[in-house]
Amino acid sequence: TKQFDLAMIAITPGGWYDWNDRSILDGSPKMNDLRPLLDKARAAGMGLIGMKAGRFLAGRKWLGWGNPDVFNKYYDRPLLEAKLSEFQRSYAFVLEHGLDAVNADMQTMQHLTENFTAAATSADYFADQIANTA
């Protein structure tokens, strides 16, 4: 529509994030299946920033904490075997599957270092997939 230049979307490797129950939206396509939609938005000139890519992993005390393995079923073996934290895996995945940036929670310098590493090396874990789609 050329009315918007940027969208901040609630998305995870498992698909859309459900704000109501703080999990993956029931019936949501997984992020791989959302890629054509994300590519269409980017081709129209819209930047996409991912929100909540790590929230479901960490959770909150009043929600029963998180589930650090929840996205593992969406990852291939090289990503699962990479020396990355569960948060780094999630950020790397969403960055290489249609997003321009990810809004990541950072409360310590260690978080900043981990998040930078995930962003800077994300393409390394998906080189084969990228080569096959080019």
What are these regions (language model features)?
Residues 3, 8, 15-134:
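Structured C-terminal cap/extension of enzyme domains
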